[in-house]
Amino acid sequence: MVIAVVVAAVCMITLTAKAVFGQASCTNTPLLVNVVASNDIAPAVENVANAFNNQNPTSAGRCVQVQVDQADSATEAAQIDGQAGRQGAAVDAWIPDSSLWVDATRSYPVGAQIVQPTGQSVARSPLMLVTTKAVATETGVFTAPPGWALLLPSSYGGPPASTGISVDLPDPTTSAAGLTSLVQVSRQLGTGPAARTAVTDFALGVQSTENFDSAAALAQFVATTQPPFDRRAITVATEQAVLGYDKNTPKAPLDAVYATGASQPLGTPELDYPYVVTASQPAVLRAAAKFGNYLQSSYAQSVMRAYGFRSSNGVPDVMPRSTELAAQQLQLASAATPAEAAANLQDWQRLGLGFRDLVLQDVSPAMNQPSGLANLSLEQLLAQTASKGLGLFPDGTQMGVWLIGKSSVSHPYTEAVPIGPLSANIGVLTRRADIDQIDATATTSPSGSLALYDAILDAYRKMSASYAPQYVNAVIVLTAGNDAHGDMPASSLVAQLQKLYNPNRKVEVIALQFGAQGNFQALQQIAAATGGAAFQVTNPAEIGQVFVEAVSQRVSG
């Protein structure tokens, strides 16, 4: 009886030790290694960590225990590099979904000091273009050889407009899949002003969405393609997320293709799930490195494949035939360089800023001249163009209007609409409706004298003094291009704008000249002094393209 009690007690002690420490031999306080992994791969990493803990690992004479938390890669990157406050325990090792986040954190002094790449990849997952079987059948969007042009407008080689395809792009500021896709589209379009305009057109046309990094997220995407929404949408997701969705809904799998890039090598981009060490204590650093090596073991890699990832060398698990996914290694696209990713992300972020514009609308007698188009005067051409252009600005745009070329006692302009949100009410009308009404009803002044350059200078001073960093700030000039007043030569205005220009508080002049009788060369010089641009408009149908070119200039200038 006594022996039985002793044996029972020993068993109880042993079981208790295993429950607390995850290993029978840990008789001292364990050396904890806190690992934070991307949300999608965290369950697989936790599975491997449990197996690692049960093998009685030690470091510097102490037992080691790994605990795994999950976090969004973008959020964790901001905390590690010091751009956001840290919540919870310090991180000793980090597994983001892409090396893009490692590059981003190391671009900051804090991140460069803390983040220590190991060169190890825990797993991989290629990116795929995804839609539903129904949308793919209705549109034939995947019948041609797949490429990143599928995300582009039809004018740049994308699907015909008649297909009604819309693009849901995971937000490149928070999604490695989205940023990688943006880089691939940029490569597809090449370099130069025309390519920059095309990228802008693409960015303005897509819908920025959450990251479709799981089966549940893809289910939300699929729901938008069904009644009552019935969207014909395409998006980008990892192979692992597609496999997860197909496993959950085997009777209605997704239609997904590997998109081939435009630059050599002509391969498919992927997320590479790097393992980086962030520990500061030498003992924890060694323990974290030990777990990193274990993640490369055959057992750990088999776990990654079981969870739908490819192993670190790109080898996939056996895949269900219904998904029609590749059960072999893929030809990979070259990874985005840090500079390439940063440049594309910067442009995207500037496009994400709202617009804050002061519009100068010419109503001088010069606007009575014929435009040479369907018996329209320049003023009528401007009115049609302005109405079309206004429709291209989102409701969050801040906008005001000055009429120039109309007699004014103290100013070379008349304020028609004060600056504010287009969606806000001014009396009974919204600001958008008020501006649209002014465009439609504005008449030229029979005796006004256009002090164009004085008005531009006054507007530039006002916008500079009231600069709002959360917007792209600009003075937009709609004019025939003639300064009839003559008090200030163009060269003087250029010199003054150059003095006022502050690259850290950037205000651009964007000039649209109507007709060919004005001094377009002067407008080009004036706009260039502020990093802006000038355009000639001869047809209202051109305004869409002019708008995209102007926005492209504002983003990259």
Go through each PLM region and give its residues.
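Extracellular/periplasmic juxtamembrane helices and adjacent flexible linkers that interface
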Residues: 1-16, 278-361, 369-380
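N-terminal segment of the mature folded domain
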Residues: 24-174
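Periplasmic-binding protein-like
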Residues: 116-129, 202-205, 250-285
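Extended ligand-binding regions for polar small-molecule ligands
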Residues: 133-149, 265-306
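Von Willebrand factor
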Residues: 157-159, 353-478, 508-519, 543-545, ...
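Ligand-binding pocket segment of bilobal, Venus flytrap-like solute-binding proteins
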Residues: 185-259
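VWA/integrin I-like adhesion module and closely mimicked acidic/polar interface patches used
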Residues: 481-530, 535-537, 545-550
